[in-house]
Amino acid sequence: AWWPLQMARELDDAILHMRTNELEMGAWVLKAAGDAAAVLASDAVLLANKDHWLVRETIGLLRRTLARLDVSSRSLFALIEEGSAFAGTLAELAFCADRAYMLALPDDAAKAPKLTLSEMNFGFFPMVNDQSRLQRRFYEETAPMEAARGAIGQALDADAALALGLVTAAPDDIDWADEVRLALEERASMSPDALTGLEANLRFSQKENMATRIFGRL
């Protein structure tokens, strides 16, 4: 199977299963493990062949699947840990999340997780309000968008990603377990429906349409 197509179909199936059958599970944790270079190579193939019908349909499926995650009324946490592959298309999972935590390993740069942007993060997978997730994140401000675009292809460590505004927090290995535990326990202590409306407001903070108003809160 072709990885981008298989990944999109399996992710879509997982989202629909969780939304339909796990109604009491109010927080979802998003992780991506593997070879970031392979993800970027896949993105390069998508970009180079974007006018081919199969690639065009695959990009469309990825766009719809990620948009389905955006309008899921659950709290989304992305954990960028050692061995993570949040690069290019998979980095969109971190940008979908309400909070993204990235592990900082200042004493072991070789093992530190990296976040890598590609051209696919700039408009190929728009949200249901027609913004890219980076545009939404930076309120369409020119300076941070240009800074992010200038980092395309760079393997960003936690400090660099935090400086660019790409992650919520970057705890070091001493604080990581407690920071993540507290964040998840805080959310789990509330009703699954308690914050979903507020989080949907933040996900679509600039531009709303009927899809965001209805599906983002159901």
Predicted regions and their residues:
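Glycine-rich beta-to-alpha active-site loop
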Residues: 33, 67-122, 149-150, 154-155
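Glycine/Thr-rich beta-alpha phosphate-binding loop at enzyme active sites
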Residues: 47-55, 117-126
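Sparse, context-dependent recognition of short Cys/His-centered cofactor- or disulfide-binding micro-motifs
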Residues: 2, 13-15, 85, 100, ...
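Amphipathic alpha-helical segments at domain termini/boundaries
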Residues: 1-7, 17, 23-24, 31, ...
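A structural preference for short, pocket-lining loop segments at secondary-structure junctions
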Residues: 4-53, 57-81, 103-108
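Glycine-rich phosphate/ribose-binding loops and adjacent secondary-structure elements
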Residues: 77, 118-137
